[in-house]
Structures are given as structure tokens and as C-alpha cells.
Amino acid sequence: MKIYSAVFIGGALGACLRYGLNLWIHTGQFPAATWLENAAGSLLLGILTGFFMIGAKRPLLSAFLGTGFCGGFTTMSTFSKETVMLLQGQPSLALLYVAASLISGIIFALIGVFVGRRIAGIQQRKGLQEK
């Protein structure tokens, strides 16, 4: 039951932050807020993945931050809706949006995994030195 609560609370916090960013970031025709949310979420999820690959396994924290927060913060449905809206009048901008979203998401996830693994490795070395 704790895992479900962690996912629920993390998801609520992530969704609230996403909503706040959408209110704060108003751009022209390019949906910058959704792009930023998905790129930042990919980076954070990459960091968590890399960290938990090497570091201590923390299922509650992983559920809260990964499934919950990142799941609530990022949004595939809004990305899809915005792409369809752009396709109606600006197909070239829609193509740019899709390409930028996919490429940056993958790149940020890779960077995140690298950073997370480095953090976990540093923590492991500190733990060994203290013993």
C-alpha cells in the first residue's frame, strides 16, 4: 500500500508542477512548456534510472519520483494533441516539434543515466572509504 501512496502523491505533485509551468510559460505557436516538461522529465527519469542501476535499491523512492512524479510531470497526451493542432495549419512546425521532442528526450535520458550512475558510483566509493 505504501508504494501506491508514493505513486499517487508523486503523480499529484508532478501534475501540479506541470500545470504551473504551463501557466507560467506562454510562448507563441511552439508548445515550449510541454517540450520543457518532457525534456526535464526525461532527464530526471534518466538520472533515477542510472542511480538505481548502481546505487542502493529504494523501491519507495523510485515509485515516488519515477512512476509518480515523472509520470505526472511529463505528458504524452498533451504532446499528441499539440502535434495534431500544429498539423492543421503548420505541418513544418509540427514536424520540428516531434523531432525536437523525440531527439531531446532520448539525449536527456542518456545524459541522465550517465549522471545518475556517476552519483551512485561516488556514493559507493564514499561508503567504502568510510569503512
Curated annotation (Swiss-Prot):
Keywords: Cell membrane, Ion channel, Ion transport, Membrane, Metal-binding, Sodium, Transmembrane, Transmembrane helix, Transport. It catalyses: fluoride(in) = fluoride(out). It is a multi-pass membrane protein. Na(+) is not transported, but it plays an essential structural role and its presence is essential for fluoride channel function. It is found in: Cell membrane. Belongs to the fluoride channel Fluc/FEX (TC 1.A.43) family. The keyword Glycoprotein does not apply. One of its GO terms (biological process) is fluoride transmembrane transport. GO terms for cellular component: plasma membrane. This is Fluoride-specific ion channel FluC 2. It comes from Bacillus subtilis (strain 168). Na(+) binds at G71, T74. It comes from the Bacteria. GO terms for molecular function: fluoride channel activity; fluoride transmembrane transporter activity; metal ion binding. The keyword GTP-binding does not apply. The chain crosses the membrane at residues 5-25, 35-55, 59-79, 95-115. It holds the Pfam family CRCB. Fluoride-specific ion channel. Important for reducing fluoride concentration in the cell, thus reducing its toxicity.
